[in-house]
């Protein structure tokens, strides 16, 4: 039975047979720059859209905290604390401590953006109550992805200092693969939470004008792109570190 090293060498030889080292290098650089640009664009877009609709008041005139309280009460969830965090767009649902964290702008704000963000985080709380499988998978992998994030942050420095480049690349590939899978699992979790938020707001009568639905939809749709960008970026980094192991520059990594 062939070893992993032999399998990797075989894969490298097959890639080298069809792709030149220069092409591999150019592709890896293009991939790196492209995914980085996508990440920047997604971050810029969600901030720009949020800034716009945070100035549009909702027709119901309720703060994000009040909207969240109404949604949780309707869902029969009474064991979650709604807390304020002094961090822009630091909103999240903490399933471990049963806390729904809203930034000050969304906790106190009465904008359509605040209403949408609060409802989205409530969507995660509803997922938790219903034992939504992808949320459970993400919760189970949090510690593992934490180690992977530490690896991708410090291993490049360690590898270049010790000149153990090939082992560094192999470990980085595994780390980015873990991060990529985590971000892949995150996609259905976030998309489902947004879908629940839009539906619940409509069912509860929070949309009292077309501007209400527009603001919520635009903010949540823009946020969705950040999760897509995170997945594509992780995939890009995985390929970026994997290509030197398979490509023509292989002897420099031995």
Question: Which residue ranges define each predicted feature?
Answer:
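Membrane-interfacial loop-to-transmembrane-helix junctions in polytopic alpha-helical membrane proteins
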Residues: 20-23, 27, 134-141, 161-171, ...
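Hydrophobic packing and interface segments
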Residues: 25-31, 159, 170, 235, ...
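Polar-ligand-bearing catalytic/cofactor-coordination segments
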Residues: 43-148, 181-254
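Hydrophobic alpha-helical transmembrane segments of small proteolipidic membrane proteins, enriched
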Residues: 17, 21-49, 165-166, 171-173
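Post-HExxH zinc-binding segment in Zn-dependent metallohydrolases
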Residues: 142-165, 170, 200
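Core hydrophobic alpha-helical membrane-spanning segments
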Residues: 30-34, 154, 158, 181, ...
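Short, strongly hydrophobic alpha-helical membrane anchors
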Residues: 1-26, 249-254
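Alpha-helical transmembrane segments
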Residues: 172-183
């Amino acid at each position: 039975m062939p070893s992993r090293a032999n399998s990797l060498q075989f894969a490298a030889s097959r890639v080298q047979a069809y792709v030149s080292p220069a092409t591999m290098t150019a592709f890896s650089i293009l991939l790196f720059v492209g995914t980085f640009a996508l990440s920047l664009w997604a971050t810029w877009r969600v901030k720009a859209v949020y800034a716009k609709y945070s100035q549009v008041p909702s027709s119901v005139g309720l703060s994000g905290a009040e909207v969240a309280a109404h949604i949780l009460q309707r869902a029969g969830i009474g064991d979650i604390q709604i807390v304020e965090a002094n961090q822009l767009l630091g909103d999240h649902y903490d399933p471990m401590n049963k806390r729904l964290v809203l930034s000050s702008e969304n906790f106190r704000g009465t904008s359509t953006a605040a209403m949408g963000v609060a409802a989205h985080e409530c969507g995660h709380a509803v997922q938790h109550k219903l034992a939504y499988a992808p949320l459970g998978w993400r919760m189970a992998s949090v510690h593992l992805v934490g180690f992977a994030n530490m690896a991708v942050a410090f291993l490049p420095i360690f590898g270049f200092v010790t000149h153990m480049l090939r082992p560094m690349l192999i470990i980085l590939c595994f780390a980015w693969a873990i991060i990529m899978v985590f971000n892949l699992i995150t996609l259905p979790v976030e998309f489902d939470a947004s879908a629940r938020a839009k539906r619940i707001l409509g069912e509860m009568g929070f949309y009292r004008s077309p501007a209400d639905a527009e603001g919520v939809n635009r903010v949540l749709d823009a946020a969705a792109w950040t999760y897509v960008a995170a997945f594509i970026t992780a995939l890009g980094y995985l390929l970026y570190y994997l290509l030197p192991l398979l490509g023509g520059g292989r002897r420099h990594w031995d």
